[in-house]
């Protein structure tokens, strides 16, 4: 419908999506733009929480920057974001709290002054505060 096309056009513009046609399949887009399509579909539902699994895996550096800006905008608007990532830079740059899991259990919780690269690496390797 015309309303659906207008909504899609606005969402594509809001997300700075690069595409040849709104009718093009998402599989024809770059990794970063394909991720934006997925996020855009969820944002149409006005979620209070987004769950993301390695959201920038396989995405080029430029698209990662745009994606990070989008996530920051969403959190500034009140959307909570919970995501899994194996990218330390991503965790340190975007998160205000990181849970390090091992075998399904929380090994460590890092936030505030404890959320540093050295603590993140140590927790990932299984080192306790006393051993650091």
Give residue ranges: language-model regions.
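Glycine-rich phosphate-binding loops of nucleotide-dependent enzymes
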Residues: 1-132
């Amino acid at each position: 419908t015309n309303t659906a096309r207008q909504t899609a056009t606005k969402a594509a513009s809001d997300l700075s999506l690069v595409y040849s046609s709104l009718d093009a399949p998402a599989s024809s887009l770059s990794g970063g733009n394909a991720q934006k399509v997925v996020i855009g579909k969820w944002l149409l539902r006005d979620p209070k929480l987004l769950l993301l699994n390695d959201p920038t895996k396989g995405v080029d550096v430029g698209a990662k920057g745009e994606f990070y800006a989008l996530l920051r905008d969403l959190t500034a608007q009140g959307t909570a974001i919970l995501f899994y990532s194996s990218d330390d830079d991503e965790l340190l740059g975007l998160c205000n709290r990181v849970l390090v899991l091992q075998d399904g259990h929380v090994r460590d919780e890092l936030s505030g002054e404890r959320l540093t690269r050295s603590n993140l690496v140590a927790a990932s390797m299984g080192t306790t505060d006393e051993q650091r």
